[in-house]
Amino acid sequence: MQGNFSKKIDPMSNLPFTVAALYCFAPLPQYESLREPLAQLCCANGIKGTLLLAAEGINGTVAGSAGAIEKLIAHITAIPGLGEPELKYSHASEMPFHRMKVRLKREIVTMGVEGIDPLKSVGTYIAPKDWNALIADENTVVVDKRNDYEYAIGTFEGAIDPQTRTFREFPEWVKQNRDRLEGKKIAMFCTGGIRCEKATAFVKGLGFDDVYHLKGGILKYLEEVPREQSMWNGECFVFDERVAVGHGLAESDVELCRACRRPLTPQDKLSQFFEEGVSCAGCYAERQKQVKLAEKRGANKHIGS
């Protein structure tokens, strides 16, 4: 189940840039031929961001004027065999991307497991309005399908952090934590929904039946569920210069450490290890880890010297 093209760009937004996050799983055997027309359209209309093309479909986040984004979405939905993408709009005060990239990939979201096809088997979609009831159920185990640095600045109440650094690590985490999932309703969520398409397909392939995922991801939940009813705590990391968004998809005060690219909350910036443009507590912790590893190997402890 995919498709959310009926959702229109908010004409009342007073912010100059429209951000469109989209994906669609569909067989695209000639996907290489789609690259140049997409790149030309985006460049001609001042659109920036990233689009990924693979034999399994399309995925990406782009930004531009409302009119430019409408042209791009119309072009994408007209691609033979593709259909309507899962689509989410938000807005930004400044262009959140530096350039436009249209890339050819083996997967539109890289899990690294052969044979995973969300078009054949996928978890049950749960609308944002129904999500709270599912995750409040005592027989539900809630799994944050994102990476550790995303979890660190915001997640749903009671969600498990698999402590993965990339999506490729998730299959191994599932195999090592089967006992935590057995006999439970498994509710997964991610930023926009695409990682859960493959994650739920993978988990169902292991024999789990009660597998669910948040339709439209955190972004759709933050857009549709009122703050006073929300079970979301913190901010949602996004992969652009906005860094994170909150309820109503409003831009947050989270920033990036320019050294290690970790998200930093205002509280993180109070750390003694934070130096603007140089380092943060995360940088320090990673460096200390490398120093200890070097000492165990008998190497020079002055890493990088």
Swiss-Prot record:
Enzyme class: oxidoreductase
PROSITE patterns: RHODANESE_3
InterPro entries, sorted: Rhodanese-like_dom (IPR001763), Rhodanese-like_dom_sf (IPR036873), TrhO (IPR020936), TRHO_N (IPR040503)
Alphabetic keyword roster: Oxidoreductase, tRNA processing
Disulphide-bonded residues: none
Reactions the enzyme catalyzes: uridine(34) in tRNA + AH2 + O2 = 5-hydroxyuridine(34) in tRNA + A + H2O
An annotated GO BP: tRNA modification
HAMAP family noted in UniProt: TrhO
Reported function: Catalyzes oxygen-dependent 5-hydroxyuridine (ho5U) modification at position 34 in tRNAs.
Family: Belongs to the TrhO family.
NCBIfam families: PRK00142.1-4
Protein name: tRNA uridine(34) hydroxylase
Organism: Brucella melitensis biotype 1 (strain ATCC 23456 / CCUG 17765 / NCTC 10094 / 16M)
